[in-house]
Amino acid sequence: MTMRYIIKRKIYWTKEFDSSHFLELEYESKCKRIHGHTYKVEVEIEGELNEEGMIFDFTHLSEIVKELDHRLIVSKEWVKEVGDLVIIEKNRKILKVPRDEVVIIDKPNVTAEYLAEWFGERIAENAGSNIKKIKVRIWEDPRSYAEVTFTLEPQGS
């Protein structure tokens, strides 16, 4: 008797990075102040092998982390860019920060949930048609993380 089998392929990647942020909250919290984390990102990508024999190039993941590492992460809704500066107005703060020290994300807040979503979207931008699922987990500390899963579906031809 011959057996038929189906291969399901995944890659897994993880890296730590250091970044600072603050949150916009309706209630009082120390997290409204600028603070930092040694984040850990975990990525799992499911798909088929591409022409090079890979599901996804790990280098693309490292580039996303490099963009975030040792930078202040802020919401697009809070900033105004003036020349080489980013002016951030939020929580009774006005900060002027050199543009190259800031990552502006197109999310309403800089929570672990939104950061995981942003990271997943960046991966999806580089994903080939061979990618089926992207899972991103962002750890803010050893006890807490946020996770998102993207299911990619081909759009028309």
From Swiss-Prot:
InterPro entries: 6-PTP_synth/QueD, 6-PTP_synth/QueD_sf. The keyword Cytoplasm does not apply. It holds the Pfam family PTPS. It catalyses: 7,8-dihydroneopterin 3'-triphosphate + H2O = 6-carboxy-5,6,7,8-tetrahydropterin + triphosphate + acetaldehyde + 2 H(+). Keywords: Lyase, Metal-binding, Zinc. Zn(2+) binds at H21, H35, H37. Its EC number is 4.1.2.50. GO terms for molecular function: 6-carboxytetrahydropterin synthase activity; metal ion binding. Its cofactor is Zn(2+). Pathway: Purine metabolism; 7-cyano-7-deazaguanine biosynthesis. The active site is at C31 (proton acceptor), H70 (charge relay system), E140 (charge relay system). Binds 1 zinc ion per subunit. Belongs to the PTPS family. QueD subfamily. Catalyzes the conversion of 7,8-dihydroneopterin triphosphate (H2NTP) to 6-carboxy-5,6,7,8-tetrahydropterin (CPH4) and acetaldehyde. The active site is at the interface between 2 subunits. The proton acceptor Cys is on one subunit, and the charge relay system is on the other subunit. This is Putative 6-carboxy-5,6,7,8-tetrahydropterin synthase. It comes from Pyrococcus horikoshii (strain ATCC 700860 / DSM 12428 / JCM 9974 / NBRC 100139 / OT-3).
